[in-house]
Amino acid sequence: MSGMGENPSDPSRAEPRKRKESIDQLGPSPKRSTEKRNREQENKYIEELAELIFANFNDIDNLNFKPDKCAILKETVKQIRQIKEHEKTAAANEDEVQKADVSSTGQSVIDKDALGPMMLEALDGFFFVVNREGNVVFVSENVTQYLRYNQEELMNTSVYSILHVGDHSEFIKNLLPKSIVNGGPRRNSHTFNCRMLVKPMMECEEEGHDGQETHQKYETMQCFAVSQPKSIKEEGEDFQSCLICVARRVPMKERPVPPPSESFTTRQDLQGKITSLDTTNMRALMRPGWEDLVRRCIQRFHSQHDGEISYSKRHHQEVLRQGHATSPFYRFALSDGTTVLAHTKSKLMRSQTTNEPQLVLSLHVLQREQNMCGLNQDLAGQAMGKTLNPVQSSSPAHQAMYGGNPGQDTTISSNMNYAITGPKEQMGMAAGRFVGSGGMNHISSLQATTPQGNNYALKINSPSQGSPGMGQGQPNSMLSPRHRVSPGVAGSPRIAPSQFSPAGSLHSPVSVCSSTGNSHSYTNSSLNALQALSEGHGVPLAPPLSSPDLKVGNVQHSPVNMNPPQLRKMGSIDSKESFGLYGEQPESAAGQGESGCHSNEQKDCSENLSSVGDQTEGQSRLLDSKGQQKLLKLLTTKSDQMEPSPLPSNTLGDMNKDSLSNFASNSMSASAHGTSLKEKHKILHRLLQDSSSPVDLAKLTAEATGKELSQESNSTGPGSEVTIKQEPVSPKKKEHALLRYLLDKDDTKDNVADITPKLERPDVKVEPTSCPKLLSVKAEKEEPSFGHSDQLMPPGSDLDNLDEILDDLQNSQLSQLFPDARHDGSNSADKQAIMNDLMQLAGDNSTGLPAGAHKQRMIRIQQNNGFSSQLAAQLGRLPNQSLPLDINLQSQVSAGSFPPMRNSAPYTTVSQSVVMNNQAMMGSQGNVSNSSPGIIGVNGPRPALKPGDWGSQASAVRPACPTPSTAINRPIQDLTRSPTASIPMRPGGQVCPRQVLQSPVINMGSSELDMNIGGPQYTQQQAPPNQTAPWPDSILPIDQPSFNNQNRQPFGSPADDLICQPIASQSPTDDGNLLDQLYMALRNFDGLEEIDRALGIPEMVSQGQAVEQESFVSPESNLMMEQKPPLYNHAYANQGQMAQNSYTPMQDPGFNPMGQRPSYGILRMQNRPGLRPTGMVQNQPNQLRLQLQHRLQAQNRQPIMNPINNVSNMNLAMRPGVPGQLREQGPINAQMLAQRQRELLSQHLRQKQLQQQQQQQQQQQQQVQQHRAMMMRGQGLAMPPNMVGSGGIPASINSPRIPQGNTQQFPFPPNYGMSQQSDPGFTGATTPQSPIMSPRMGHIQSPMMQQSQASPAYQSELNGWAQGNPAGNSMFSQQSPPHFGQQSGTSMYNSNNMNISVSMAANGNGMNSMNQMTGQINMTSVTSVPTSGLSSMGPEQKYC
């Protein structure tokens, strides 16, 4: 029943249910509501579960059926089980460190592969691993975002292929094991920066590899590196050297701040011409020097370099072709030496309407690099204005020196400062002496501007450096002679050059360089510049000169200044040319603009210069250097600046101004001083000191003589132009033209300044290497070498002086630089060849030329021959050429500066201009000698000499040998000019002996004078081949022995000089007449050539310096020559010879080696006894001709020797080194020389004995006399026995005193030897080494020093002086005692010599004091000599 009852299908039951349900539904029921709510929640959770189980509803939709609760629950259970199983597996493999995917944080949701890239993205870098070999083991894919390389491209490639080469070392350091890098522990992690190569764009790749290389770009990446990863190491493989890095870009804030850049814009037309300039940005920055920056940038951008088209042209072409262009980076230097890196971006602007190109817009971006210049950068840069190329700017000293070179000059500048400062201090009196003139003031700037960095060492080491002239002259070398100390005061131009030259000084450069210091005369500066160019020395110094600012600044001070018209023309042309030569420099380009314009002439000049430079080995290279270019430019500019004060317009006073302005530091005081001098002296001084060029000299001469300067190419303005034009055509031709002009100009005897033949001298010949155009027009620039010297030197005396100076410079510098070159026998041959060429030219031009002109020409030729030999020895060394020019300048300066001391009155009578020229020449040479060889004492004393001193000495000398002076007036003037300068060198020397020396010099004539000047300076170096060496030899004692060997001159030379001089001094008037006759006879070249052949000059030249020296010695004095050998060969011989040579050397030092470069000469003499013969060689041609004249007069040397013996005192006064000696030597052949030497030896032995006795007796007296002489130094008896010895040989002829001590040395009677023995202190130095102090020079001491040492009394005083003169004194003192002891026999001369020695010592102490001393000593010796040598002194006293 129940079952049935329960059966739902039972109808009876169904109905009641329905009823119940309906009844229940009629009202609310809590039970129903609860059930419903539960169902709803169940469905909701199931849906949520389904969402969790299935990734998305799409998966649900993908199901064939709509998931019900059961399906959802089923899937849920399935996944839960999977998770459980996964957890179990993970737990089994679980490491100590819980895995992220197992972490309860839910990180398992993040894809493991995405985590690395996400981290690299956050770091802004890429990941790479490098093994020990530097190969990339792994690199992340995002490397493409940074380096544009694909992952595959870098995998297994060397990491160094993408690293900048500069970062390889840093990367290796981090890659190597820590134990290898620093030997100590290192953190496993470290950070470093490196530059990585960015793959070029596809476009760049398509352009080609070159383009890629050109456009390589590096991205600076900061690398975080970890080495020695522990986990990897433990895996069994050693990856400890593996580097794991994350590289990221360096944040902007961490990137180095680039140096601030400046920019300005320019607009150019389609032809590249700048139409507008916008410097708004530059002005806004207001950085100092922005105007100069813009100017120099444009100059550099538009200047040509290395024969290529300029940046601007190439850039402009590229812009027109492509529409835009970026120039390569180029550098240039500002005036302060700051180097600027610049590049230019340009775009072609087109018309919007026609699309036609309208203009080019250029943006010049400039970045100033750290100033490379140092010490004097500001000084030099500001003063010079323009600087050299940036590379040159690296040397602040040099820049300061030149002021124009920011770099190169800078280095020299620092040296310069030392050179100027050191030498000044060293010089003491010398510096002070020059300080008086404006020179010292200029020196401060010159320190920055002058290429004296190289000089510094030489200056300090060499007497020349110690000498006032050198010390100050060098600083003033950049300055115009007016502002500069006179050449003599400034010091020997050749010394300064040699100081620079040795380095190459000049290169040097800078020595420029150069050393242009002493050659403050235009010639000297030019020579230094060219010398620096030729030597390549430093003349990077020169480049600064080329800078426009520098140019402007230095033009006024340039010794190279030419006449105003000439300067004006040349100012633009030269500047252009200099720029053309150094067109490479942007600065030079600017300078060109400043000069006036960039003209074709500039190109031509550059070409000429290039060709000329090619001719002169290395000169072209030097010229190519911007520094050299700047130096030449500066020289030229100096000339331009000198324009304001045209030399022709200036009176003799002006000339003196220029020469003395260095002295007085103001042209007015100099002018006043010059005015006090006679017109001839003034002209000579001015020509020597102020004349920037031959044209200037010609102008001055014309003013003095009333002649027109327009006669020849030497005319001031036109002459310069002509010279410029001619020189480019052919240096030789131009020289010939100049020589013709000078010869035709009829250099008056009195007006040595008129003697322009110097323009033709071998200097020019050698100079052909330089552009002829530059030689003359640019001579101001190139003056440093040869052509300019010719231009600078007056047509007559200046040329003669120039020749002598060139010889001296060559001798000094070449010997210093090339000791061997001096000794080359080829020198004589070259000199002879040059002489012949010049003589031929002269002969061609001689027709219609006055005898005087021809003489001058011959002198010049002879000198040129000497110079040529020297140059040949030097093998075309421009520095030597420069040196001669420098010497010439110094001569000029000396004339102004020293002439007052030496030849105010003394030589005024005979031929003041000549004497002055000679004095200036000799003085300059002396100064040069002082500067070059280190005969500081001599140089110093010489400055001490006053015009009055010189005057007294010169006047005394002239009165003593007035006839010779008159007879040989002009020749002597030439010679005297130099000898006079030399004479002051020997303050202790007797005035009379100096006079005697003058007489022989006068007898020798202009040509002889030149020769003598060259010779006396080198008298000890008589060998012509050694002429280049004489100065150097004197400077270099080591060279002396070779010189002694080279020529028997060491002993014979001084004696021969004396002998020759005695011949000349037989009768001043007769000698002068004979000289005139001889010159007239020799007027034509053929005649001269025949005479030379008759005299055996060609053979002598071919034989070499030794032979030439001997020949010269013989002509000068058989006795002297013969005595010389004994002196050199034997100590006693040296004494005797010293006695004679002492006087001769003493005079020679003062006169030639000593006079012009007292200290220098002495040292030179010391350095090589043969130097004097070398000097003699210079004088050789003149001496030979003079000898011919003498022969015409006496037809034999014996009469001459007898007169010399009789006039031994006169010979002393004349000084053996004087041309007279040389003259006699010329005619003497080898046999004669040998015989004379033997005679001299025997005489010397006898004289030595007598001298020793006399010296022993008179040593004390002489010492007292020396003191007196020192006190009397200022009295004007600047001519000590030494001087007397030089000039004393001629005096010897008249005076027996000289033979007393030196008769054996020379043909002079023993009396002469005795008298000269008093001078032996100097003679001793002359006989072996220098004309003045050859005997002592043989010992290494300068002629003056030697002479001083010759007499015991003098020796002691000399020792004292030696103390005063550290450089020359010690040498003097060393040789002085022996010589003095030897010469004690010549009591008179001994006393004189003692005085002279004192004077020499004083010279050691200071040139001025020495010069003063010389005058005093002369008087003292004359007055106090009366001891044993008083009789000998008699004739000299008579002359006095």
UniProtKB/Swiss-Prot annotation:
A motif (LXXLL motif 3) lies at residues 739-743. GO terms for cellular component: nucleus. It comes from the Eukaryota. Residues 26-83 form the bHLH domain. SUPFAM superfamilies: HLH, helix-loop-helix DNA-binding domain, Nuclear receptor coactivator interlocking domain, PYP-like sensor domain (PAS domain). It is found in: Nucleus. InterPro entries: bHLH_dom (IPR011598), bHLH_NCOA1-3 (IPR056193), HLH_DNA-bd_sf (IPR036638), NCO_DUF1518 (IPR010011), NCOA2/3_DUF4927 (IPR032565), NCOA2_bHLH (IPR028822), Nuc_rcpt_coact (IPR009110), Nuc_rcpt_coact_Ncoa-typ (IPR014920). Belongs to the SRC/p160 nuclear receptor coactivator family. Transcriptional coactivator for steroid receptors and nuclear receptors. Coactivator of the steroid binding domain (AF-2) but not of the modulating N-terminal domain (AF-1). Required in a nuclear receptor pathway to suppress expression of dorsal mesoderm genes. May play a role in the positive regulation of the circadian clock. This is Nuclear receptor coactivator 2. The gene is ncoa2.
